Amino acid sequence: MAAAADLVVPTLAIRSSVAVELWSSAGSKQPFEHKPHLPREETKSSRSICFSSNGRYFAYSNGQEVKVLQASRDSAASWPVICVLPRPKAFYLQFSPRGSYLCTWEHYAITKDRPEGSPNLLVYEVATGVEVFAIVQKNQADWQPSWSADESIFALVVGGEALFYDLGEGAEKGFATTSRKIGGSRGGMLSLGPGNCPPFLAFYTPGAKGAPSMCKLYKYPALGQNQTVACKSFFQADRVEMLWNKRGSGLLLLTSTEVDKSGASYYGNQAVHFMATKGDTCSVPLSKEGPVHCVKWSPKATEFVVVYGFMPSKAALYNLKCDVVFDFGEGPRNCAYFNPFGNLIALAGFGNLPGAVEVWDVSKREKLANLKCADTTVFEWHPNGEWFVTATTAPRLRISNGFKVYHYSGALLHETMWPQGQELLGIEWQQFADKTFSEPKITKAKHEGIKSSQPEASKKAYTPPHLRLLKEGKNPEKYLPQPSIPGLAPTAAAGGVNGNKRNNKNKQRSARKDVNVVNGGDADSAPTEVVDQAAPVARQSPVFVAAEERKPQHTPRQKYQPDNAADQPPNSYGQGHPNGQHISDKERKIRSVAKKLSDIKKLKVRRSQGENLELNQLNKIKMEAQYLDELKALKQSA
């Protein structure tokens, strides 16, 4: 494996806010960088880059045109331009399976010259750059046409109807006229299976007027009403994603609804169904409630993985009978990625998850590595099956853009952070034809790597600011800013008698209220006046002295003079504690019982006025004698 990897130079295609360029490395221990002989074009308007599946061609848009380059395996060879296509607004690019054709898609637009609109899906022959097909395709989500593996069949869905074009040897019509059609209802979807020639194909029809949604399998060219190979119907499906295995013998359907009528999920609900070209169909059993995050086929075409359920989600490996053959357990993950040989799988949690990545040996069912790839928006295995790249790209994240290359053991092989003010928009590996690399032998040996230049996030638990000083044994109030007024003493600004008259009045009312409750609610037993202890300090200021000289002297109102003022001890409640602070447990109990007696007194008044009381209120009145005895006992013990 190592020898094969050294013979082929790994190349990364990079699209940024300033250029489209290719980077390469001389080996696993050498850094990735742009070589002088590799293409680099400065452009701020590139929207798409694309390799053909066999790695022969590389295409990109630059805002003026689309260029197609011929790729080279030689580390010293250049990449010549094969053709230039006049598509300045190209938004998506896609090669046919063998790289003979390039499809371009751009946003549909209407102009004064062409009010009916211009074709926005075009197909070009790569060798000559000649346009061979053009059509209006308004659907952006499912714009990609379908191809058979040998490129003999070209198909696409327009307005819910699937159109087929025969391009094989001896075909007379080619792209000029459709050879077959199927469907016709709105929202239809088509997918041609790989591997077989002629291929199997799946056509999905959404449900309408109470009829269920339906997916049918056909063997091309037998597309008649009674020529279906398999059929699967389901009611809960507003949308479906069709996933073929590499051999084209099995199809997975990920169905989803936009709204969950049960209210269990904000994002609707999902289900996974399996269809085989032999005619078998079944639903994939899921043992945990919640959404289906990811479904992926193994390149071996005999197994598939499903990541599902509320967080922490579950991940399980299934066989072609839809039986669970291995359970990866639960964890913070929502993505799964098989390497090109299917002997390694990476389970990851990206998006709103912290970026934990687990690498598993699929054949031995054991975990090989745990690593953290925070803020990852792109994950892709290298064709050699041993490396993978992770990247943080815009517009998903516009800060800390860059990419890293890892070995499956978790070792970091390369790291490049994008310069400040620039954005990394896209990155992908050069593809290679089958059997270019041999399947790697998986070992537990740790690979030598480099240390990341990015600081690691703190693993300590978050502590709120108001608790940080308490953990250090300090009083937080000591560090709070104190209010101050120029020319006044600090204590006066903090709330002396004359510093804030409203606060002083509130304190007096609070103190009188507390004493009223203790004395049974008699207002005449309240203290004469509550004196703020900060007042003498505040009056030391010249400003307050002058204010006191001008202030008229008023005697306290007689209604607040207590009848037993001379008999009250100096430290009685209300005088010793003007703000109602530091009261004893016994005083607190007296307050509570007095409050209950006050409520009973009000209830009795309401009853005497003819008001009908509730049963619990009548029971409360019956407790009056018990509360009076309790209050008497508390006062005697005091």
UniProtKB/Swiss-Prot annotation:
Which Gene3D superfamilies does its entry note? YVTN repeat-like/Quinoprotein amine dehydrogenase
| Keywords noted in UniProt | Initiation factor, Phosphoprotein, Protein biosynthesis, Repeat, Translation regulation, WD repeat
WD repeats sit at 287-329, 331-370
Task: Give Gene Ontology CC terms.
Answer: cytoplasm; cytosolic small ribosomal subunit
Function according to Swiss-Prot or TrEMBL: Functions in the early steps of protein synthesis of a small number of specific mRNAs. Acts by directing the binding of methionyl-tRNAi to 40S ribosomal subunits. In contrast to the eIF-2 complex, it binds methionyl-tRNAi to 40S subunits in a codon-dependent manner, whereas the eIF-2 complex binds methionyl-tRNAi to 40S subunits in a GTP-dependent manner.
Similarity comment text for this entry = Belongs to the WD repeat EIF2A family.
Per its record, how is this protein called by name? Eukaryotic translation initiation factor 2A
Which gene name does the record give?
A: eIF2A
